[in-house]
């Protein structure tokens, strides 16, 4: 579809939006405070005065609590989120200074589908969500844990994230679209992540989720709203993709119809039959008298069957005989001469040749043909007057035999005899019918066989699980021993009456046809279970269950360039540029791309007045020859810090800075745990209170205040009894396509877009499917003729994958 058409539709949506207005449909929003019935909740919350009096506000106290929704509320939330690409999470909060806590969380076990968190430890707002089944986190630096009232609204429109704080647009980002089809069993928590973690300390008011575009208007009605939203555009693109899918299906049907039409054009509309110069229409029937058959024209083909003759009940003075020009025998008077009975047309040689006609022997005169044989080979056929040579073909002249009988020559005559497997009808072998050997028990099929009647014969079929020995016998088939089975190599094959069965060996699971090794504790971080309780770990992990990360830095496995330092990551590592150096844009894993920052040329130094800036590797120096201007003072935040002055940063009470000879040096405050007035926020290692300890997310390990650890691709820290986690810092990659390998947390560069799991789709880069239909980048379709193969257009590349579970079920 041309882009100008997209813009036209976009304009129409925008115009319609302007006309309709932005009134909030109550069915498309959820008031969390009301749904959780906090008024009647006493443990851990108390109603207090809020930022305004239009709604109730609640203080979330610093004690264990369980503020979550009832099952029917969670089900309502599932329905509201289903297939939605636009929603806003908003609340009015007053958070205790320097604390961290979750404002709202929608979770299922360990998975945060939607979560809004405020960290006073790192002064940032975090949005946790799920994309394609994998956790994602957006960290937005902002200090909200300051004891002041704030209105926060986080809006998501497809891949567009917008954060408003106090009706000011703070951040706008492009993110991975979140999964909005929530699974059964999710739960909605307010003021906490779960029973023990993420406890919010402060007041929450107006907690809501709005399922409409620009939901922040509910909180800040005076804000301008844009038109259209990212989701509007996504809907248009999805509409185009749906049209492309419909076009592909219609193209396939059209191609099939054209093929059928082409075939029809090569044949007559009405199939006729031409026989002996006569034209018969479809379904016409006629009698082929020459061959005594009933024939029918069926779709241009002639089908003929032997004419069936009715049984004859001739009187005692008549006999059934064939009459020329007729297919069935008729009753005709018989003749008797000298005790011999003659049928109509039969002859007898006395003194003269006589023939039976109408019951009377009539004298006939017949010239016998000369014979080409010696006299001793002359024979007189039965009921004939002329002699023939021995070996004469009587069938060529003789009786008409039916389709299930055959003519047989004798010395002096020809007769009809039923074919094998047929029996004469009323004693007349010219007409024969099939013998059902199975029903008549005239077969020789042995045990473990089934008799199957066929025209003129029968067949002995083996029952399932048996194989043929000869035409009449079958024996049990050892499918397991012969290898003629479909059991997995890790399954036990057992012969059965019906064939065989497959059962997975101990330590393996599956249906017997497919068996996979089972590891009781699983294989973590992308490890593969290759044998019972045996894992093969991916690069970067070790342990019996791949549970241990290999610290490439501390174990000296790698060596970074001296301009960088080694930073360990789960399953991997990277060399991070040291202070005073930056990456040149090429990104080298070993840190060779780290080059010196020239603070002098960039004017990022702090040299004052007459002092000269001298660039050094990883830093700079201030050189002042002499004179009154060589004070060594340092410019700082629009002011001046004197040489030797020491101060604490306003935005970070745990850092202390000093000015020395024109250069500013900052460091973390030194901690003296012997000093009873030590700031435990800055020196958590000095906090020995049991209440300041933290349980990890799994509830298995206890950490002291100040301890750090890694969990689910996040760096976590225990501080005064509460756990605060933030995304691991990953290296900045300059490549077009990236992918996060199984078990790892940070992306790596890949050259093939089909391998990329984080890709920005360019709808201008289209793909051609197998029908020749152009597909937009990001489109997904099923491959023609292969229902288990799914294809996706990734910036001009068709990337297909096979669903092996689908193959097993089909």
Curated annotation (Swiss-Prot):
InterPro entries: ConA-like_dom_sf (IPR013320), EGF-like_Ca-bd_dom (IPR001881), EGF-like_dom (IPR000742), EGF-type_Asp/Asn_hydroxyl_site (IPR000152), EGF_Ca-bd_CS (IPR018097), EGF_dom (IPR024731), Growth_fac_rcpt_cys_sf (IPR009030), Laminin_G (IPR001791). Ca(2+) binds at residues 434-435, 437, 453-454, 457. Glycans are attached at residues 40, 53, 83, 224, 294, 372, 511, 562, 609, 708, 732, 758. GO terms for molecular function: calcium ion binding; heparin binding; protein kinase C binding. Keywords: Calcium, Cytoplasm, Differentiation, Disulfide bond, EGF-like domain, Glycoprotein, Nucleus, Repeat, Secreted, Signal. Disulfide bonds join 395-407, 401-416, 418-432, 438-451, 445-460, 462-474, 480-493, 487-502, 504-515, 519-529, 523-535, 537-546, 553-566, 560-575, 577-594, 600-613, 607-622, 624-630. One of its GO terms (cellular component) is cytoplasm. GO terms for biological process: cell differentiation; negative regulation of osteoblast proliferation; negative regulation of protein catabolic process; nervous system development; positive regulation of bone mineralization; positive regulation of ossification; positive regulation of osteoblast differentiation; regulation of gene expression. Changing residue 553 to F: In a colorectal cancer sample; somatic mutation. Plays a role in the control of cell growth and differentiation. Promotes osteoblast cell differentiation and terminal mineralization. Homotrimer. Binds to PKC beta-1. Interacts with ATRAID; the interaction promotes osteoblast cell differentiation and mineralization. Interacts with ROBO3. This is Protein kinase C-binding protein NELL1. It comes from Homo sapiens. The lineage of its organism: Eukaryota, Metazoa, Chordata, Craniata, Vertebrata.
